[in-house]
């Protein structure tokens, strides 16, 4: 079979698959060369040097970012500056305060518009992760409604004020319901890790399609009996 014949056969197969799939669904397939090249949208970190260091100019939109470091190294302060930048860009911001330690006075002093900041202080890991997933899903629904109205009115969609940044502070502070309701001596092996894995699988496509950046703050800890490699883990 010649190269041209193979290419034609592949095109036929792909056309059949595309015919059965909706253009807006995730199972639609098309050749990358047929799609317009899209630059990665970003939200500034609030730090010019970090924006430059990241290579794309800030936090990428529609992605999940882990911001980790040792205790008291300025992670939350960096995130507050990112919130300021997002608000100046006309984006809505949600702060999931699992540590129950958000200093509103300090945030206002830095320049955060705390009046327009959405804040939640969930008690359990399940509540926190469900909230992040629900925020992404709701934002995706709203985004599609705006796009549909703009298409009907033949105008450009206006996403000003829509949720664009979600902060989870922090992964290390998430407490599973079973641990919260259990006894001090009960063993709960890798509960948060399993929940985070499941949540990531749910949040990743929703965050991408809703164009929402999720920043998960995490603590850096020493590995126990680390024989080789980095002694740190998150």
For the regions a language model picked out, list residue spans one by one:
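General beta-strand structural signal in soluble alpha/beta enzymes
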Residues: 95-97, 119, 168, 216-217
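Conserved P-loop NTPase "ATPase switch" module shared by AAA+ and STAND
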Residues: 162-180
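Conserved nucleotide-binding/hydrolysis micro-motifs of P-loop NTPases
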Residues: 99-103, 123-126, 171-175, 197, ...
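Phosphate-binding/switch region of NTP-binding enzymes
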Residues: 157, 189-234
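The Walker A/P-loop phosphate-binding site
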Residues: 3-117, 128-145, 149-151
């Amino acid at each position: 079979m010649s190269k041209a014949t193979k290419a034609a056969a592949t095109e036929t197969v792909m056309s059949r698959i595309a015919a059965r799939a909706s253009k807006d669904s995730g199972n639609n397939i098309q050749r990358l060369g047929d799609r317009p090249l899209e630059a990665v949208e970003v939200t500034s970190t609030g730090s010019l040097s970090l924006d430059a260091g990241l290579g794309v100019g800030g936090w990428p939109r529609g992605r999940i970012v882990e911001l980790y470091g040792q205790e008291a190294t300025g992670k939350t302060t960096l995130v507050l500056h990112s919130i300021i930048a997002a608000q100046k860009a006309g984006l809505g911001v949600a702060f999931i305060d699992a540590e129950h330690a958000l200093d509103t006075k300090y945030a206002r002093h830095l320049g955060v518009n705390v009046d327009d900041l959405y804040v939640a202080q969930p008690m359990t890991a399940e509540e926190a992760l469900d909230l992040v997933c629900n925020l992404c899903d709701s934002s995706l629904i709203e985004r599609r409604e705006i796009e549909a109205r703009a298409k009907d009115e033949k105008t450009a969609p206006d996403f000003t004020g829509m949720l664009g940044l979600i902060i989870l502070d922090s992964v290390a502070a998430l407490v599973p319901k079973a641990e919260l309701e259990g006894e001090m001596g009960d063993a709960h092996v890798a509960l948060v890790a399993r929940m985070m894995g499941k949540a990531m699988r749910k949040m990743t496509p929703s965050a991408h399609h809703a164009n929402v950046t999720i920043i998960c703050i995490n603590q850096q800890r020493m590995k126990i009996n680390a024989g080789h490699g980095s002694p740190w883990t998150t």
